Amino acid sequence: MASNNKDSQLMIALKDIVAGSIGGVGQVFTGHPLDTIKVRLQTQSVGNPIYSGTMDCLKKTISQEGFAGLYKGVASPLVGLSIMNSVMFLAYGQSKTLIQKLSDNPNEALDLKGLTAAGALAGIAIGFVDAPVDLFKSQMQVQQGDKNQYKSTADCAKQIWKVGGVRGVFQGLGATLVRDIPANACYFGAYELCRDFLASKDNISVNQLSSLQIMAAGGAGGVSYWTLTYPADVVKSTMQTDAIVKSQRKYKNMIDCASKIYKQQGIAGFYKGFTPCFIRSVPANAACFVLYEKARQIMS
């Protein structure tokens, strides 16, 4: 009996890993162009900005670099987000199981508080994968024109490791965790809440939801993720596009980074690039969740 239970838990974990990876690929291809615009707007100079807004950044990027410019740094999240989403869905599933076992009613489904707690725990695991992936991606995305320091994502990772070692690779980890822990609590909480609402409205089980309904719930999760934690993402991106060599950095740590952003730009500085990010959050996360759920159903 114990062996069967272990086999069942292992299969659930494997499904989360495979389905999460598939969802991650869909999320990258759908959302990366707007992510590039977001990072460029977040990290451009305050005194001499290159772009006046989202559309200006889009036009100039395509004009100067072609459509390929929108996919700069895509290799890092394509590999990294596949791994990250595998970790995310696995950690979320295992966290739900753990919280359920520790609850007063282990045989009952988790309430919203339990689901958001599971999302927060998953955010801790994700942060350690997310930090280096976002670092390589962001360093690549801010390169413009032909004057590129890095030839490829692999070259970027190699140079950062050579100059900064482990600390260099995990530059911005603190800010990543500050973002990822509450963000994933909101992300999964909103997704589960919306999914349950749509199922109860039509008097069906969540497994009977249509692809469009799953996409709607995924989009709601994405909006929740970014709306509440975007300022932390600005700090993270600013730190991760700073110099890798410690003596050349503008910011000592995330507190110093946040205080300098506020001093130079006010509250508005924490919302640079929010428009493309908000637009991206719906289709990218809709694609992620529908592919995850459908892949899981096929494997079942």
From Swiss-Prot:
Topological region Mitochondrial matrix: 31-72, 137-168, 233-272
Induction per the UniProt record: Up-regulated by phagocytic stimuli.
Residue ranges, Mitochondrial intermembrane side: 1-9, 94-115, 191-211, 293-300
Entry's transmembrane regions: 10-30, 73-93, 116-136, 169-190, 212-232, 273-292
Ranges occupied by Solcar repeats: 11-98, 110-197, 209-298
Domain of life where this protein originates: Eukaryota
Membrane topology: Multi-pass membrane protein
GO molecular function, one term: transmembrane transporter activity
One Gene Ontology term, aspect cellular component: mitochondrial inner membrane
Cell location: Mitochondrion inner membrane
Family, per entry: Belongs to the mitochondrial carrier (TC 2.A.29) family.
Protein name: Mitochondrial substrate carrier family protein G
Lineage start: Eukaryota, Amoebozoa, Evosea, Eumycetozoa, Dictyostelia
Gene this chain is encoded by: mcfG
